[in-house]
């Protein structure tokens, strides 16, 4: 499994948290149990307060699988899926 950081950005006008139909659906996507059914492991998520940026740390077989699973977030803005490493791995190899 590979590690990824997914970043979703949207405008205040398209904030899914304020959409009563979309918000519960997006929370289901961020459920560790639902991600596991898709073969992914969610390590955490955070929203930068007031910035309309969501960050998700996720392990998956490849970038395409992560992008497909989190694809609903792209409906309200952008979705970037970036290959990542843990700090321990970076220090172990001596470079980012």
Language-model region placement:
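A common structural junction motif
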Residues: 73-81
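Short amphipathic alpha-helices in soluble, non-transmembrane regions
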Residues: 65-74
């Amino acid at each position: 499994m590979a590690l990824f950081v997914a970043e979703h950005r949207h405008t205040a006008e398209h904030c899914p948290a304020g959409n009563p139909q979309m918000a519960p659906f997006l929370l289901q996507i961020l459920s560790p149990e639902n991600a596991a059914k898709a073969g992914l492991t969610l390590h955490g998520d955070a929203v930068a307060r007031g910035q309309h940026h969501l960050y998700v740390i996720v392990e998956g077989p490849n970038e395409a699988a992560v992008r497909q699973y989190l694809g609903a977030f792209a409906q309200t803005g952008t979705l970037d899926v970036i290959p990542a490493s843990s700090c321990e791995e970076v220090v172990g190899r001596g470079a980012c």
